[in-house]
């Protein structure tokens, strides 16, 4: 089980990234738009730098829904590999069977 503080910190980052998603994407698009003047692009970059660090979506870490483990994460199930294997062996994940050939 991951530390509760790490899980809570990540949840806080998710909320902040979601709150600033529109503004962040508009500024990023303006900063990368080659048709704009160089000064306008620079202004967009400076405004992006003024946003809170946790508003950046790359700071959000995918974590297991059951344990909070950050590594070995399967997006389709939102579980880490250990919990996925455990639940699949118990038959609690529909459509997942043990491989046999």
From Swiss-Prot:
The gene is rpsN. Keywords: Ribonucleoprotein, Ribosomal protein, RNA-binding, rRNA-binding. Part of the 30S ribosomal subunit. Contacts proteins S3 and S10. GO terms for biological process: translation. Pfam families: Ribosomal_S14 (PF00253). Coiled coil: none annotated. Belongs to the universal ribosomal protein uS14 family. It comes from the Bacteria. GO terms for cellular component: cytoplasm; small ribosomal subunit. One of its GO terms (molecular function) is rRNA binding. This is Small ribosomal subunit protein uS14. InterPro entries: Ribosomal_uS14, Ribosomal_uS14_bac/plastid, Ribosomal_uS14_CS. Binds 16S rRNA, required for the assembly of 30S particles and may also be responsible for determining the conformation of the 16S rRNA at the A site.
